[in-house]
Amino acid sequence: MAIISASLIPTAILALSSLAMAAPQRRDNSTAPGLSLTARLQLADTAVQRYSLLPNDEDFVYDFNTTKFPFSNRESFPALEGTGGGMAVGELPPCGMTFVHLHPRAAELFVVTSGRVLTEMVPETTVLDASGKQRVIRTDLGVNQMTVFPMGSFHTQVNPECEPARAVAAFTSDDNGVSVIASQTFALSDGVIERTFGGSIAGEDIDRVRDAIPTRVAIRVDECLAKCGLQKRAV
């Protein structure tokens, strides 16, 4: 056992005190005022601390029946923070088609729970079909059938029937994001658009095309409308 001289004890205490003062001090950012619950959950040092920020059992329930926002992500449902997942539940009206879109931070697992849904998905540029053209993957889904849209792939869903279709989508991120291809493409400058389309859209027509792009979440399919005797309108 080592023996420490009494004369060295004050020096040792001073040294330890200076080390303690120099050591990083924990600041509880998880309770910082003005931050959203999601932001505080992100700042929590451990998963255990995140649970303390969600003290009620109701914090772990997201009710798709009552919410106006059919997508659960870490903003709308903070309990998802750190899980790496999100979900959406939705209804596609008769003859409805979602905009061609992509999710920049997640793959989507899409399951039909009622009705019928046709899907089209375009993977990355170098994925070609047997003829050397861009491959387009098309599916015809019934109840309890699923497809996958890889992260960043262009895709759309169409209800070709006269009754609503319902589906559930799971995402591999708690912040999947969405990009709508047509409206974002035509947000570029006129010169870029004209050159991108090889001059097939004249400069004077670009604003007309921009204005024609629907702004709602889904659009109607003309052929289906005629079959079902429905009136065309954005939905």
Regions found by a protein language model. Give the residues of each.
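A short, N-terminal "cap"/entry segment at the start of jelly-roll beta-barrel domains
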Residues: 17-89, 99, 213-235
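Double-stranded beta-helix
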Residues: 29-32, 130-137, 158-235
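Short, conserved secondary-structure segments in the cores of folded domains
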Residues: 88, 98-100, 108, 137
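Short histidine-centered beta-strand/loop micro-motifs
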Residues: 98-103, 158-159
